[in-house]
Structures are given as structure tokens and as C-alpha cells.
Amino acid sequence: MNIRPLHDRVIVKRKEIESKSAGGIVLTGSAAGKSTRGEVLAVGNGRILENGEVKPLDVKVGDIVIFNDGYGVKTEKLDDQEVLIMSESDILAIVEA
């Protein structure tokens, strides 16, 4: 995938979740709901501050993140993959193993 996000934008691939119902039935896809976790595929150079300096992003390629799946998060299809384009501010946490 050849894509380079600009500024404080981040490209994330949503991770599939598997959950079970109260009866033990495995729910996948739309029945399980959309995951708000994903893997960072690409990051921009950083956020431009008011003084013109560029602040590097805290997230890096390969990080597993929890994100806000709301307004401002754009879904795109690239190389037959659905990816999300978001600002770093839409990322709530980095999952550390």
C-alpha cells in the first residue's frame, strides 16, 4: 500500500473482533459490532503548531490503538482493504502488550 498521510493524519486498519453472546454463540461482523481497535499502517509527519514547528506524532506504524469511531474518521478502500483515515486526536490510547 503506497499512501502517506499528511500532517497529523493516521491510517488505521480496523481489527476484527470476535465476541460471544450470553448463550455462547460466537458473533462476528455486524452482529458483533464494529471494533474501535486497529493497527496503525502509516502516519503523517506531525501536527503543525501555531509557531510553525512540527510536533511529531506519538503513534507509530505497527501500534495497536483504540480510537473514537465518530465524526471526522473517514473510511477509504485502498488495495482492496478498508482503512480509516483519522487525526491523531481521534486516537484515545495505544495498547501496550
Curated annotation (Swiss-Prot):
GO biological-process terms attached to the record: chaperone cofactor-dependent protein refolding
Show the SMART domains listed in the entry: Cpn10 (SM00883)
Q: PROSITE patterns attached here?
A: CHAPERONINS_CPN10
Enumerate the subcellular locations listed in this protein's record, separating them with semicolons: Cytoplasm
Extract the InterPro entries matched here: Chaperonin_GroES, Chaperonin_GroES_sf, Chaprnonin_Cpn10_CS, GroES-like_sf
Signal sequence extent: none
The family database entries (Pfam families) matched by this protein are listed as: Cpn10
Molecular function terms, GO-annotated? ATP binding; metal ion binding; protein folding chaperone; protein-folding chaperone binding; unfolded protein binding
- Keywords assigned: Chaperone, Cytoplasm
Cellular component per GO? cytoplasm
Protein family? Belongs to the GroES chaperonin family.
Oligomeric state and partners? Heptamer of 7 subunits arranged in a ring. Interacts with the chaperonin GroEL.
Q: Explain the purpose of this protein.
A: Together with the chaperonin GroEL, plays an essential role in assisting protein folding. The GroEL-GroES system forms a nano-cage that allows encapsulation of the non-native substrate proteins and provides a physical environment optimized to promote and accelerate protein folding. GroES binds to the apical surface of the GroEL ring, thereby capping the opening of the GroEL channel.
For this protein, the record's HAMAP family field holds:
CH10
Task: Please report the name of this protein according to its UniProt entry.
Answer: Co-chaperonin GroES
- Organism equals Cronobacter sakazakii (strain ATCC BAA-894) (Enterobacter sakazakii)
Lineage runs: Bacteria, Pseudomonadati, Pseudomonadota, Gammaproteobacteria, Enterobacterales
